[in-house]
């Protein structure tokens, strides 16, 4: 299980990303439309003004049950070992174990 502080930190990053999403998108759109390099630099400076944690690249997908940040499956929202345990216990409908 991940530490509670790390999970809360990730939730805080998600809220910041949602808050500054429109500002980032509008700034990127302006940069693509303006041909002048000097004006692009000004807008780029404005793009750097939001907090670092509001960038979407700083977000991590976490396991729904344990909060583990690695080896997550998007379809289920679970980490690999929890997914395996749940499939073996037949708790995930439609998931089958492979055998060959």
UniProtKB/Swiss-Prot annotation:
Keyword Chloroplast: yes
GO MF assignments: rRNA binding; structural constituent of ribosome
Stored PROSITE patterns: RIBOSOMAL_S14
GO biological process per UniProt: translation
Localization per record: Plastid, Chloroplast
Pfam families for this protein: Ribosomal_S14 (PF00253)
TM segment ranges: none
Keyword match Ribosomal protein: yes
Cellular component per GO, a single term: small ribosomal subunit
Database matches in SUPFAM superfamilies: Glucocorticoid receptor-like (DNA-binding domain)
Keywords: Chloroplast, Plastid, Ribonucleoprotein, Ribosomal protein, RNA-binding, rRNA-binding
SUBUNIT field: Part of the 30S ribosomal subunit.
UniProt family annotation: Belongs to the universal ribosomal protein uS14 family.
Job description of the protein: Binds 16S rRNA, required for the assembly of 30S particles.
Protein name as it appears in the record: Small ribosomal subunit protein uS14c
């Amino acid at each position: 299980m991940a530490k509670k502080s790390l999970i809360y930190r990730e939730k805080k990053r998600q809220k910041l990303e949602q808050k500054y999403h429109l500002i980032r998108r509008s700034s990127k759109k302006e940069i693509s439309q303006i041909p002048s390099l000097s004006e692009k630099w000004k807008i780029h400076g404005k793009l750097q003004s939001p907090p670092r944690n509001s960038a979407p690249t700083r977000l991590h997908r976490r396991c729904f049950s344990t909060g583990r940040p690695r080896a997550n499956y998007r379809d289920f929202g679970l980490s690999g070992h929890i997914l395996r345990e749940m499939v073996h216990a037949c708790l995930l409908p439609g998931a089958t174990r492979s055998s060959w």
